[in-house]
Amino acid sequence: MAELKVFYDREGKTLTVWFTDRSQEYVCEETGDEVVLMKDRDGRVIGFEKLNFSVPDSDSLRVALETAPA
């Protein structure tokens, strides 16, 4: 995984995270927990979207990325 893309849509109240090129999206699967998984043709999860996600107007959205040791 070379690049991680995170999109926050305040108006649409969604947080979308892509693990790879979003043009590879083939199908979406709703999990029932207000989370949608985006998958490629091989069924691999390439991203997810959290529905009804919001950050209070007074707060900043900060994203921290940590990697696990090999």
Please report, for each region that a protein language model flagged, where it lies by residue:
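Small, basic N-terminal interaction modules of short regulatory proteins
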Residues: 1-70
